[in-house]
Amino acid sequence: MTYCIGIKTKDGIVVASDSRTNAGLDNVNIYSKMFTYDVGDRTVLIVTSGNLGTSQAVYKTIEKDLEDKSGKKNLNTCEDFDQVAKYIGALNLKHSSPKGMNTDTVLLGSTFIVGGQIKGKPMELFLIYPQGNYIKPADSKPYLVIGEVKYGKPILDRVITPDVTIGDASRCALISMDSTLKSDLTVGPPIDFVVYKKDGYKILSQKCLNI
Protein backbone atom coordinates (compact mmCIF):
# COMPACT_ATOMS: atom_id res chain seq x y z
CA MET A 1 0.00 0.00 0.00
CA THR A 2 1.04 3.62 -0.14
CA TYR A 3 -0.11 7.11 0.78
CA CYS A 4 0.18 10.19 -1.43
CA ILE A 5 -1.05 13.75 -0.91
CA GLY A 6 -1.52 16.71 -3.24
CA ILE A 7 -2.63 20.11 -1.90
CA LYS A 8 -3.36 23.17 -4.02
CA THR A 9 -3.20 26.50 -2.18
CA LYS A 10 -3.51 30.07 -3.38
CA ASP A 11 0.30 30.34 -3.11
CA GLY A 12 1.40 27.02 -4.60
CA ILE A 13 1.20 23.24 -4.52
CA VAL A 14 2.42 20.72 -1.93
CA VAL A 15 2.94 17.06 -2.86
CA ALA A 16 4.10 14.18 -0.64
CA SER A 17 4.42 10.41 -1.00
CA ASP A 18 5.79 7.50 1.00
CA SER A 19 8.27 4.98 -0.43
CA ARG A 20 7.21 1.59 0.94
CA THR A 21 5.98 -1.31 -1.17
CA ASN A 22 5.17 -4.73 0.19
CA ALA A 23 3.94 -8.12 -0.92
CA GLY A 24 3.56 -9.53 2.58
CA LEU A 25 5.30 -8.87 5.87
CA ASP A 26 8.50 -10.59 4.72
CA ASN A 27 8.78 -8.81 1.36
CA VAL A 28 9.10 -5.06 1.96
CA ASN A 29 11.00 -2.73 -0.36
CA ILE A 30 11.58 0.97 -0.95
CA TYR A 31 10.65 2.61 -4.25
CA SER A 32 10.08 6.30 -4.93
CA LYS A 33 6.54 6.98 -6.10
CA MET A 34 7.23 10.55 -7.20
CA PHE A 35 8.24 11.96 -10.59
CA THR A 36 9.15 15.65 -10.99
CA TYR A 37 9.65 17.52 -14.25
CA ASP A 38 10.98 21.04 -13.79
CA VAL A 39 12.37 22.86 -16.83
CA GLY A 40 11.74 25.99 -18.86
CA ASP A 41 8.16 27.19 -18.74
CA ARG A 42 6.59 24.32 -16.78
CA THR A 43 6.71 22.26 -13.61
CA VAL A 44 4.94 18.90 -13.38
CA LEU A 45 4.69 16.91 -10.14
CA ILE A 46 3.41 13.31 -10.16
CA VAL A 47 2.82 10.76 -7.38
CA THR A 48 1.24 7.34 -7.73
CA SER A 49 -0.50 4.55 -5.86
CA GLY A 50 -1.37 1.07 -7.10
CA ASN A 51 0.44 -1.47 -9.23
CA LEU A 52 4.16 -0.66 -9.09
CA GLY A 53 4.88 -2.20 -12.49
CA THR A 54 2.24 -0.04 -14.15
CA SER A 55 3.46 3.11 -12.38
CA GLN A 56 7.08 2.50 -13.38
CA ALA A 57 6.03 1.76 -16.97
CA VAL A 58 4.17 5.08 -17.13
CA TYR A 59 7.16 6.98 -15.70
CA LYS A 60 9.55 5.27 -18.13
CA THR A 61 7.33 6.11 -21.10
CA ILE A 62 7.12 9.76 -19.99
CA GLU A 63 10.92 9.92 -19.91
CA LYS A 64 11.30 8.18 -23.29
CA ASP A 65 8.75 10.49 -24.91
CA LEU A 66 10.64 13.53 -23.57
CA GLU A 67 13.83 12.27 -25.25
CA ASP A 68 12.06 11.58 -28.55
CA LYS A 69 12.76 14.34 -31.11
CA SER A 70 10.19 13.22 -33.68
CA GLY A 71 7.43 15.50 -32.40
CA LYS A 72 5.69 12.79 -30.42
CA LYS A 73 3.26 13.90 -27.70
CA ASN A 74 5.05 14.54 -24.39
CA LEU A 75 4.99 16.79 -21.34
CA ASN A 76 6.79 19.54 -23.29
CA THR A 77 4.21 19.65 -26.07
CA CYS A 78 1.15 19.86 -23.79
CA GLU A 79 -0.36 23.34 -23.98
CA ASP A 80 -2.20 23.18 -20.65
CA PHE A 81 -2.69 20.82 -17.71
CA ASP A 82 -5.83 19.28 -19.16
CA GLN A 83 -3.60 17.97 -21.94
CA VAL A 84 -1.05 16.79 -19.36
CA ALA A 85 -3.79 14.85 -17.54
CA LYS A 86 -5.12 13.35 -20.79
CA TYR A 87 -1.60 12.32 -21.85
CA ILE A 88 -0.79 10.61 -18.54
CA GLY A 89 -4.27 9.09 -18.40
CA ALA A 90 -3.77 7.54 -21.84
CA LEU A 91 -0.41 6.07 -20.78
CA ASN A 92 -1.96 4.74 -17.58
CA LEU A 93 -4.78 3.02 -19.47
CA LYS A 94 -2.34 1.57 -22.01
CA HIS A 95 -0.05 0.05 -19.38
CA SER A 96 -2.94 -1.05 -17.13
CA SER A 97 -4.48 -3.15 -19.91
CA PRO A 98 -1.72 -4.93 -21.88
CA LYS A 99 -2.91 -6.94 -24.85
CA GLY A 100 -3.62 -10.60 -24.21
CA MET A 101 -3.93 -10.28 -20.44
CA ASN A 102 -7.11 -11.00 -18.51
CA THR A 103 -7.62 -7.79 -16.55
CA ASP A 104 -10.68 -9.31 -14.82
CA THR A 105 -8.38 -11.44 -12.67
CA VAL A 106 -5.15 -9.43 -12.62
CA LEU A 107 -5.08 -6.06 -10.86
CA LEU A 108 -2.79 -3.79 -12.88
CA GLY A 109 -4.31 -0.39 -12.20
CA SER A 110 -2.50 2.65 -10.84
CA THR A 111 -3.87 5.98 -9.71
CA PHE A 112 -1.94 9.25 -10.10
CA ILE A 113 -2.03 12.72 -8.59
CA VAL A 114 -0.64 15.24 -11.07
CA GLY A 115 -0.07 18.91 -10.27
CA GLY A 116 1.93 21.91 -11.38
CA GLN A 117 1.81 24.84 -13.75
CA ILE A 118 2.57 25.82 -17.35
CA LYS A 119 3.62 29.44 -17.94
CA GLY A 120 0.64 31.67 -18.64
CA LYS A 121 -1.79 29.08 -17.29
CA PRO A 122 -3.25 28.57 -13.79
CA MET A 123 -1.90 26.01 -11.35
CA GLU A 124 -3.75 22.71 -11.55
CA LEU A 125 -4.17 19.51 -9.55
CA PHE A 126 -5.73 16.32 -10.96
CA LEU A 127 -6.46 12.77 -9.84
CA ILE A 128 -6.08 10.30 -12.73
CA TYR A 129 -7.80 6.90 -12.54
CA PRO A 130 -6.62 3.58 -14.05
CA GLN A 131 -9.29 3.96 -16.75
CA GLY A 132 -7.58 7.17 -17.93
CA ASN A 133 -10.26 9.62 -16.80
CA TYR A 134 -9.46 12.36 -14.29
CA ILE A 135 -11.00 14.85 -11.84
CA LYS A 136 -10.05 18.05 -10.02
CA PRO A 137 -10.45 18.56 -6.26
CA ALA A 138 -13.47 20.45 -4.97
CA ASP A 139 -12.94 24.21 -4.62
CA SER A 140 -13.95 24.00 -0.96
CA LYS A 141 -11.43 21.21 -0.22
CA PRO A 142 -8.48 21.75 -2.58
CA TYR A 143 -6.59 18.54 -1.91
CA LEU A 144 -6.36 14.98 -3.23
CA VAL A 145 -5.22 11.78 -1.51
CA ILE A 146 -4.66 8.25 -2.84
CA GLY A 147 -3.69 4.95 -1.28
CA GLU A 148 -4.18 4.33 2.45
CA VAL A 149 -6.15 7.52 3.09
CA LYS A 150 -8.21 6.86 6.22
CA TYR A 151 -5.62 7.81 8.85
CA GLY A 152 -4.28 11.00 7.28
CA LYS A 153 -7.46 12.45 5.82
CA PRO A 154 -9.11 13.82 9.01
CA ILE A 155 -6.42 16.48 9.58
CA LEU A 156 -6.66 17.53 5.94
CA ASP A 157 -10.44 17.91 6.25
CA ARG A 158 -9.99 20.17 9.27
CA VAL A 159 -7.13 22.37 8.02
CA ILE A 160 -7.15 22.54 4.22
CA THR A 161 -9.43 25.31 2.92
CA PRO A 162 -9.24 27.59 -0.13
CA ASP A 163 -7.44 30.19 2.01
CA VAL A 164 -4.79 27.94 3.56
CA THR A 165 -1.22 29.19 3.16
CA ILE A 166 1.47 27.09 1.54
CA GLY A 167 3.30 26.94 4.89
CA ASP A 168 0.27 25.62 6.77
CA ALA A 169 -0.46 23.20 3.93
CA SER A 170 3.11 21.86 4.15
CA ARG A 171 2.86 21.32 7.90
CA CYS A 172 -0.56 19.71 7.52
CA ALA A 173 0.73 17.33 4.83
CA LEU A 174 3.58 16.20 7.08
CA ILE A 175 1.23 15.64 10.04
CA SER A 176 -1.14 13.71 7.77
CA MET A 177 1.72 11.55 6.54
CA ASP A 178 3.05 10.99 10.07
CA SER A 179 -0.40 9.90 11.28
CA THR A 180 -0.54 7.32 8.50
CA LEU A 181 3.01 6.07 9.15
CA LYS A 182 2.18 5.47 12.80
CA SER A 183 -1.11 3.69 12.05
CA ASP A 184 -0.36 1.55 8.99
CA LEU A 185 2.69 -0.66 8.54
CA THR A 186 2.19 -0.79 4.77
CA VAL A 187 3.12 2.91 4.55
CA GLY A 188 6.70 3.84 5.36
CA PRO A 189 9.59 6.28 4.93
CA PRO A 190 11.47 7.87 3.35
CA ILE A 191 8.93 10.54 2.45
CA ASP A 192 9.35 12.44 -0.81
CA PHE A 193 8.16 16.00 -0.21
CA VAL A 194 7.94 18.81 -2.78
CA VAL A 195 6.74 22.42 -2.63
CA TYR A 196 6.01 24.44 -5.77
CA LYS A 197 5.39 28.21 -5.55
CA LYS A 198 2.83 29.81 -7.86
CA ASP A 199 4.30 31.37 -11.04
CA GLY A 200 7.78 30.17 -10.08
CA TYR A 201 8.07 27.54 -12.84
CA LYS A 202 10.57 25.63 -10.76
CA ILE A 203 10.41 23.54 -7.60
CA LEU A 204 10.83 25.69 -4.50
CA SER A 205 11.80 22.83 -2.17
CA GLN A 206 12.34 19.09 -2.65
CA LYS A 207 13.29 16.83 0.25
CA CYS A 208 13.53 13.14 1.13
CA LEU A 209 12.53 12.81 4.79
CA ASN A 210 12.95 9.94 7.25
CA ILE A 211 10.14 10.90 9.61
Where do the protein language model's features map onto the residues?
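N-terminal nucleophile
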Residues: 1-211
